[in-house]
Amino acid sequence: MALIVQKFGGTSVGSVERIEQVADKVKKFRDAGDDLVVVLSAMSGETNRLIDLAKAISGDQQPLPRELDVIVSTGEQVTIALLAMALNKRGVPAVSYTGSQVRILTDSAHTKARILQIDDQKIRTDLKAGRVVVVAGFQGVDEQGNITTLGRGGSDTTGVALAAALKADECQIYTDVDGVYTTDPRVVSVAQRLDKITFEEMLEMASLGSKVLQIRAVEFAGKYNVPLRVLHSFKEGPGTLITIDEEESMEQPIISGIAFNRDEAKLTIRGVPDTPGVAFKILGPISGANIEVDMIVQNVSHDNTTDFTFTVHRNEYDAAERILQNTAKEIGAREVVGDTKIAKVSIVGVGMRSHAGVASRMFEALAKESINIQMISTSEIKVSVVIEEKYLELAVRALHTAFELDAPARQGE
């Protein structure tokens, strides 16, 4: 008998019919003898509807963060109560709790709170009594008793945090895909589902644009060594297990996956006086505006001037460009140029640690397709490049093939 935390997202509980299906799935596990804690999101689209209501009543002002948390947290209350009802109807004793009722204690950063502590006694008492415990994801309570929410993707984090607090055997994340793939199957039809991947690799892929799991949830799972499994909500299958283990084998590919991100933009400030502290003068104001910088390249100095290039999220390009224009005037740079038609492609794999020449193999594959590399960034288990956006899908397919990630052709194909 195992203790399992299961998390179902908004699509999985998007209607009464789907909640009934989730109840059937939970019952199967309960009938097999497992203890279950189930974490739910609000119905698909419900959080946005509640936010729109708050915006409508607030007019020209931003909704008050505290009150926004109060209204948004009601979405999960609906789904947890409905699932508890559906389970009891099936003869499965179940009880639902909000984040505050099970004392998911957070800081007071409304709309983006972080979990500090979980009091697991109430849940353990119910589990011991044979009940399935259904908990609202995405929310908690601060020391003053105020309702807080954890930000987008917070339900994944709730699931992992509960699994860590309860020392669960596994945290299962149910979604609309049947696991983690070597890359997006919509781009590469021969992408393969991974049976297993490390926390490190999953964290890199999540940070590079993979939408399967939220970064905070993966970080939490890695920190507390919570085995994560990504599964399809309504299809049977083993899914993908995410663990701390690195199993070396002769058959194991060097690269686990190809990640990509279309939401990149590039800014270059040219003719920058090459003096100590110039990087801070350029990036300090950008950071001060809470704009996250990704890749950075500084050219070799020529005539005591240099060019400085960095990438930001495309949504923040205009704000970053305005700041950079002001900086250019202040430091005496020649000009600012930008490009929003770029994309980032990355190869990820712990196998890089023990294999030389991985980056050159990547560059060779792109060169064969006449794809120019504009920027390069590396880490211990990742190599990222910036290219023209129009070549993105070609690059992903070429790299997927070059690193032997393509699924073998079925007989008769």
UniProtKB/Swiss-Prot annotation:
Localization terms from the record: Cytoplasm
Subunit description: Homotrimer. In the presence of inhibitory amino acids the Stokes radius of the protein increases, suggesting its oligomeric state may change.
Domain ACT: 267-341, 347-413
Chain's role: Involved in the biosynthesis of L-aspartate-beta-semialdehyde which is a central intermediate in the biosynthesis of different amino acids (L-lysine, L-methionine, L-threonine). Catalyzes the phosphorylation of the beta-carboxyl group of L-aspartate to yield 4-phospho-L-aspartate.
Keywords: Allosteric enzyme, Amino-acid biosynthesis, ATP-binding, Cytoplasm, Diaminopimelate biosynthesis, Kinase, Lysine biosynthesis, Methionine biosynthesis, Nucleotide-binding, Repeat, Threonine biosynthesis, Transferase
GO MF annotations in UniProt: aspartate kinase activity; ATP binding
Reaction catalysed by this enzyme: L-aspartate + ATP = 4-phospho-L-aspartate + ADP
Assigned EC number: 2.7.2.4
SUPFAM superfamilies per the UniProt record, alphabetical: ACT-like (SSF55021), Carbamate kinase-like (SSF53633)
GO cellular component, as recorded: cytosol
Pathway(s) the chain acts in: Amino-acid biosynthesis; L-lysine biosynthesis via DAP pathway; (S)-tetrahydrodipicolinate from L-aspartate: step 1/4; Amino-acid biosynthesis; L-methionine biosynthesis via de novo pathway; L-homoserine from L-aspartate: step 1/3; Amino-acid biosynthesis; L-threonine biosynthesis; L-threonine from L-aspartate: step 1/5
Origin superkingdom: Bacteria
GO biological process: diaminopimelate biosynthetic process; homoserine biosynthetic process; lysine biosynthetic process via diaminopimelate; methionine biosynthetic process; threonine biosynthetic process
EC class: transferase
Name the UniProt record assigns to this protein: Aspartate kinase
Family, per entry: Belongs to the aspartokinase family.
Activity regulation statement: Activated by L-lysine, L-methionine, and L-isoleucine. L-threonine, at low concentrations, is a mild activator and has a weak inhibitory effect only at concentrations over 10 mM. Strongly feedback inhibited by the concerted combination of L-lysine and L-threonine and slightly feedback inhibited by the concerted combination of L-threonine and L-methionine. Activated by the combination of L-methionine and L-lysine, L-methionine and L-isoleucine and L-lysine and L-isoleucine.
